[in-house]
């Protein structure tokens, strides 16, 4: 059995294959990567955080749409953690993102005693 672990990190809101300046399509962005991944039962997709802030798209989503849009874009992630920039837009925005994520949140150095959101320090996956 071969297991594939695909890890992303520091997306900083760059989901679409563009730099948002010249509007030309580029071989970048999270969605461009997903188009090239063949995910199966032996593929684990993880993300290391710093997802919510950093691009003009991320700022637009924060101002006008809400973090559930970004959670929808990240729906294929099995396990994720939070980076320091994920806290930039405040507790309620981050909480909404976490509540809408399908993957499991892993953080050994974060607790939330008010919301009841499950935050695990690690995970064991049996295959």
PLM feature spans:
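Acidic, metal/ion-coordinating pockets
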Residues: 1-127
């Amino acid at each position: 059995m071969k297991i594939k672990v695909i890890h992303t990190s520091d997306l900083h809101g760059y989901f679409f294959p563009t730099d948002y300046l010249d509007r030309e399509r580029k071989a970048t962005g999270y969605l461009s990567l997903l188009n090239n991944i063949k995910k199966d039962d032996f593929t684990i997709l993880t993300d290391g955080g710093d997802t919510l802030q950093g691009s003009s798209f991320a700022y637009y989503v924060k101002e006008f749409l809400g973090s559930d849009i970004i959670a929808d874009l990240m729906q294929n992630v099995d396990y994720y953690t939070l980076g320091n920039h994920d806290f930039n837009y405040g507790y309620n925005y981050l909480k909404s993102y976490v509540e809408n994520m399908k993957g499991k949140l892993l953080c050994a150095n974060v607790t939330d005693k008010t919301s009841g959101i499950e935050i695990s320090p690690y995970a064991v996956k049996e295959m």
